[in-house]
């Protein structure tokens, strides 16, 4: 991400102007001074516990670049969580890194992470049950290491273009079912989607976590709408549900995607713009604490097999949908050839959908964050 450096220099002024929210800090661990950049949203209120996201940079990158590249700050402003961007140490090749078992690194980054959580928790009101880890590339690898080696502190992880080392699963024994999201491009030339001699393939890693959490298989696979044909890639959403403690495993397969963070403002060809990785990661994290699913009655937490009442069916002028969630949902109705003919929002309770303008025929109804609710609706026409 060296190409980001010049651009980021131009963005430093807003950071300094907003210094009450963006804080540079450091702690000493194992005799090393370890730095970080902390983002605290304006809505943070001392005494009210908030989630913490650990956002780890990639190999050769740094925490400032990651703060802009895999940006969670606008989401934190509305959701209210704190996000910290730790800085790795310099390896024998002179590059910033996280110790995931590569080369001859002996840095105790797992211990540093635990100490950083302790330090931040002593200053800010952190919800100890809602601490999450994410990262780009080497930072994604490290998030998997934390899922294995610091699971008593980490509620869920998400990796972007990272994976796990070969045979790492043999010693990985999390203390609780670990919700995992993996976002990875099939054209990634840095961390190959199909793996190599040193690290496991993305499908292998995703399947291992789904099996460990005892999720339902096979996954539900949804092709995401190609909203930006100029990005040179498309996205599939693979969702494994109903794991222990309500855990799930999600994988965004970026077909034609490169070694990039989807939705990043610093994009280009091979950077998928059909999804926003940061938004999807928070949507995923927000469902879980360290004990598992927080609120099974929310839309995004509902299992894909859940039942939704859509009636009468066949219908004439109106279809009624019973929406059992507090969250506002989105629905769409498609004709048999795939054309979207109707869409809108669903509020808690009964929703009366006007179908009077539709021609008689068969339509496909879907609703929910991953289109987890589906139904075939027959429209008979006006009576």
Indicate where each model-derived feature is located:
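C-terminal outer-membrane/trafficking sorting elements
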Residues: 300-383
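Serine-hydrolase catalytic machinery in alpha/beta-hydrolase-like enzymes
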Residues: 23, 27-132, 145, 149, ...
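The feature captures the conserved acid-bearing segment of alpha/beta-hydrolase catalytic domains
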Residues: 155-245
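Bacterial Sec-dependent N-terminal signal peptides
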Residues: 1-21, 296-299, 339
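Extracellular low-complexity, Gly/Ser/Thr-rich intrinsically disordered linkers
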Residues: 248-289
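The conserved beta1-alpha1 loop
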Residues: 54-58, 161, 184-185, 255
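Acidic beta-to-alpha connecting loop that harbors the catalytic carboxylate
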Residues: 88, 186-189, 256-258
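A domain-start/cap signature at the N-terminus of enzymes
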Residues: 18-52, 78, 130, 134-158, ...
């Amino acid at each position: 991400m060296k190409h980001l450096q010049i651009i980021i220099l131009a963005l430093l002024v807003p950071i300094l102007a907003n210094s009450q929210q963006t804080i540079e800090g450091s702690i000493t661990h194992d005799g090393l001074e370890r730095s970080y950049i902390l983002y605290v949203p304006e809505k943070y209120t001392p005494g009210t516990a908030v989630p913490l996201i650990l956002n780890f940079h990639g190999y050769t990158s740094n925490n400032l670049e990651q703060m802009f590249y895999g940006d969670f700050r606008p989401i934190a402003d509305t959701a209210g969580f704190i996000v910290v961007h730790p800085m790795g140490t310099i390896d024998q090749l002179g590059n910033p890194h996280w110790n995931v078992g590569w080369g001859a690194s002996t840095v105790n980054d797992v211990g540093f992470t635990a100490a950083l959580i302790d330090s931040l928790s002593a200053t800010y009101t952190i919800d100890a049950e809602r601490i999450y880890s994410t990262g780009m590339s080497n930072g994604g690898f490290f998030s998997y290491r934390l899922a294995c080696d610091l699971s008593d502190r980490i509620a869920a992880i998400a990796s972007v273009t990272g994976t796990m080392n070969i045979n790492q699963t043999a010693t990985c024994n999390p203390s609780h079912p670990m919700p995992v999201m993996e976002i990875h491009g099939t054209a990634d030339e840095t961390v190959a989607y199909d793996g190599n001699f040193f690290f496991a393939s993305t499908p292998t890693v995703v399947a291992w976590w789904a099996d460990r959490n005892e999720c339902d298989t096979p996954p539900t696979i949804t092709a995401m709408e190609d909203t930006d044909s100029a990005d040179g890639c498309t996205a599939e959403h693979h969702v494994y549900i109903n794991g222990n403690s309500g855990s799930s495993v999600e994988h965004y397969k970026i077909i034609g995607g490169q070694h990039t963070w989807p939705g990043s403002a610093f994009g280009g060809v091979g950077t998928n713009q059909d999804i926003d990785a940061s938004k999807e990661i928070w949507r995923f994290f927000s469902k879980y604490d360290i004990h598992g699913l927080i609120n099974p009655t929310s839309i995004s937490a509902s299992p894909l097999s859940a039942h939704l009442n859509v009636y009468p069916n066949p219908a004439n002028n109106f279809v009624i949908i019973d929406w059992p969630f507090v969250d506002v949902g989105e629905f769409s109705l498609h004709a048999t050839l795939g054309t979207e003919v109707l869409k809108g929002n669903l509020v808690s309770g009964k929703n009366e959908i006007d179908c009077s303008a539709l021609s008689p025929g068969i339509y496909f109804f879907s609703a929910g964050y991953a289109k987890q609710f589906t139904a075939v609706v027959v429209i008979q026409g006006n009576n």
